[in-house]
Amino acid sequence: MSTIVKICGLTTADTLEAAVEAGADMVGFVFFPASPRHLDIDFADALGRQVRSRAAKVALTVDADDDLLDAIVEQLRPNWLQFHGSESPERVRSIKRIYGLPVMKAIAVAGPDDLSVLPDYAAVADRILFDARPPKDATRPGGLGAAFDWKLLDGVNLKLPFLVSGGINAGNVAEALRVTRAQGVDVSSGVETSPGEKDPDLIRDFIRAARAA
């Protein structure tokens, strides 16, 4: 299976087109007001229509309530839901049942103890995303450009695909994939010139490097 490449936090038509044309498998739209990549649903819908069927549309939320999820699913019609908050395994199972959509659950990693929740989430999610645990004073759970110790994933043996994120860019994506043996990578800040400002050239460089890894 080829490496799954996800570009997350896209906010403009130009950067979305760069990601899709370069061969991204998944494109992520963020629905979390504290993030500089936050989109309102109407604009996300316009970007989603631009994607057509060229990549999977991923709706990223953080502890979203049912009303927000209803609106996102009805208007954007995403292919995937990504949960980046403290959603419980029971919540993941319930939402999958309600919407009939696959779910990718992010697990924040700083040390080995953070992996203790993995079996419970692996039993209900369709993909797992390992991301760096943010500082306690952070206002958002991801997209901070911080990496975790990839060697912590030594011995992780999942029956479902998993992706890695956090501090990954074109210069280190090959090493991230080699060390973690992940089936995919998810990048946001690693293809930006400033928070929320994606760069088409950095997107293309990242996808090229991930494919060559």
Curated annotation (Swiss-Prot):
Enzyme class: isomerase
Keyword presence, Amino-acid biosynthesis: yes
Keyword terms, alphabetized: Amino-acid biosynthesis, Aromatic amino acid biosynthesis, Isomerase, Tryptophan biosynthesis
InterPro entries: Aldolase_TIM, PRAI_dom, RibuloseP-bd_barrel, TrpF_fam
EC number: 5.3.1.24
GO molecular function term, any single one: phosphoribosylanthranilate isomerase activity
CDD domains documented for this protein: PRAI
Superkingdom of origin organism: Bacteria
Any one GO BP annotation for this protein: L-tryptophan biosynthetic process
Similarity comment: family membership: Belongs to the TrpF family.
Protein's name in the database: N-(5'-phosphoribosyl)anthranilate isomerase
The encoding gene: trpF
